[in-house]
Design a protein with these regions (language model features):
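Alpha-helical solenoid repeat architecture
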Residues: 90-95, 134-138
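Extended, compositionally biased eukaryotic interaction scaffolds
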Residues: 79, 110-116
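Structural recognition of alpha-solenoid helical scaffolds
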Residues: 47-50, 62, 66-69, 92, ...
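Extended, hydrophobic/aromatic-rich amphipathic alpha-helical segments that build helical scaffolds
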Residues: 82, 86-89
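Extended acidic/polar regulatory tracts at the flanks of large eukaryotic scaffold/adaptor proteins
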Residues: 2-67, 81, 117-204
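Elongated alpha-helical scaffolds that mediate protein-protein interactions in large eukaryotic proteins
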Residues: 40, 60, 95-106
């Protein structure tokens, strides 16, 4: 009940958020803007889960709209904004299923995801680069192997091979962090699951 109340409060708070551009953003874009605001010192779990719910409920072009907006924030100059966006991306991947997985598996998305990666790996990756490498490694070992639609996710495997060829080293993914992407896992939308997600995001 507490998690549901928090998400309802987030919906009320951000549903009328003004636009910072000339165009009026969609409800989904306003939520993503709120989730990735540089004023946030840590991920807002309630807003992140509300975004996942919006993607699932609206369907249609919502997965593509969300993936495009999120990857733009991942490339933000402010590393805190980029890390917030990566945390949001993780929530969406683990809660939105195939329609969203299909978007992150496109060549366009993956090229944008690694746009700030130099041709030669740095001696030590930045926190943002490390989180991106971790995400790609996690996707390769989970949805690219266990999803019934894994044949549609070949570009993720291709990107993993390309980065490995260039010399990038992928971190080991914690089993409990990746387990939620297994088909047999229960929903992560219970209060207990919300706490687990929040603890995971605080490690970013």
């Amino acid at each position: 009940m507490e998690a549901a109340s928090a998400r309802a409060a987030a919906r009320d708070r951000w549903s009328d958020m003004p636009s910072s551009s000339g165009r009026t953003p969609s409800q989904l874009q306003r939520f993503i803007q709120a989730a990735c605001s540089p004023e946030n010192y840590e991920p807002n779990l309630a807003v992140n889960l509300e975004i996942a719910d919006l993607i699932n409920s609206k369907k249609g072009t919502a997965p593509r709209e969300a993936a495009t907006a999120i990857v733009n924030y991942i490339n933000h100059r402010n590393p805190n904004v980029a890390l917030l966006a990566l945390g949001l991306l993780d929530i969406c991947v683990k809660n939105c299923g195939y329609p969203f997985h299909l978007q992150i598996g496109t060549k366009e998305f993956l090229n944008e995801l690694v746009r700030r990666f130099p041709e030669r790996p740095p001696m030590r990756p930045t926190r943002v680069q490390a989180k991106i490498l971790e995400a790609i490694e996690e996707w390769r070992g989970t949805i690219c192997e266990t999803s019934r639609y894994k044949e549609d996710l070949g570009f993720i495997r291709d990107m993993h091979r390309l980065l490995s060829y260039k010399g990038y080293v992928f971190p080991e993914v914690r089993r409990e962090d990746a387990a939620v992407l297994n088909p047999s896992d229960v929903s992560w939308k219970s209060p207990e699951s919300c706490v687990s997600i929040l603890n995971m995001l605080r490690r970013t």
